[in-house]
Curated annotation (Swiss-Prot):
Annotated residues for binding of substrate: 76-83, 143-145, 156-158
Protein name: Octanoyltransferase
Alphabetic keyword roster: Acyltransferase, Cytoplasm, Transferase
NCBIfam families listed in its UniProt record: lipB, PRK14345.1
GO-annotated cellular components: cytoplasm
Main localization of the protein described in the UniProt heading: cytoplasm
Gene3D superfamilies: Bira Bifunctional Protein, Domain 2 (3.30.930.10)
Swiss-Prot/TrEMBL catalytic activity: octanoyl-[ACP] + L-lysyl-[protein] = N(6)-octanoyl-L-lysyl-[protein] + holo-[ACP] + H(+)
Chain positions of site Lowers pKa of active site Cys: 140
Organism listed in the record: Thermoanaerobacter pseudethanolicus (strain ATCC 33223 / 39E)
Length: 228
């Protein structure tokens, strides 16, 4: 079984989270571990991926959007999405050379991880043709946007546990106009987010065939003031 590390944090500002990813990326690139899974939440923030769609997917004046949350253009695939408290953001920094050099398979396994997680709560979730992510009916509960460099992945997934979904009303999330978003809470499941994180780690381990040892930020030589 592959050997990896998991880093569990609390609410971390978006750009600090990016720096943590880059530190983890370097550790994986050096071969010190097969992969690092970072789990955290962000303060309210909108991010726009390389697919763009800046103008048509923001439904309010830009100044109004920026009053609600920060806004960043980022390196991941996809268009605009929202991150905020109550949403688990998982950044799997994995060396695909240790699995298969297949990005589509990696995304499929990310989806499978969340589908299996939701099964634990009696929620039937699945995929939707032409779209990435995990869906419950016609509503997306987990968005996926990754980047890959030298076959090492970064960025990742955003899974709605008890997120304030009103923030999604200001955008066409992921550029999708015909379908909505949902959360575990909206589906009637009120679970402590830390317990959901634990189950998520188990499902990552199961689907990707990797054993995780928990680490701290000190292991990545990051000076951080995150609320762990």
């Amino acid at each position: 079984m592959r050997k990896g590390e998991v880093l569990k944090l609390g609410i971390v500002p978006y750009m600090e989270g990016k720096e943590i990813q880059l530190k983890a990326f370097e550790r994986v690139k050096k071969g010190e571990t097969d992969g690092i899974l970072i789990l955290l939440q962000h303060p309210p923030v909108y991010t726009i991926g390389v697919s763009g769609g800046f103008d048509e997917n923001i439904l309010v004046p830009l100044a109004e959007l920026k009053k609600k949350a920060e806004l960043y253009k980022v390196e991941r695939g996809g268009k605009i999405t929202f991150h905020g408290p109550g949403q688990i953001v998982a950044y799997p920094i994995f060396n695909l050379a240790k699995w298969q050099k297949d990005v589509h398979l990696f995304v499929y396994k990310l989806e499978e991880t969340i589908i299996k997680l939701l099964e634990e709560y009696g929620i039937k979730a699945g995929r939707k043709p032409k779209y990435t992510g995990v869906w419950v009916g016609d509503e997306k509960i987990c968005a996926i946007g990754i980047a890959v460099r030298r076959w090492i992945t970064w960025h990742g997934i955003a899974f709605n546990v008890n997120t304030d979904l009103s923030y999604f009303g200001l955008i066409n999330a992921c550029g999708i106009t015909e379908f909505g978003v949902t959360s575990m809470q909206k589906l009637g499941i009120n679970e402590d987010i830390e317990k959901v994180k634990e189950k998520m780690v188990d499902k990552f381990s199961e689907v990707f065939g990797i054993h995780f040892n928990e680490i701290t930020l000190d292991r990545l030589a990051v000076i951080d003031n995150a609320k762990a």
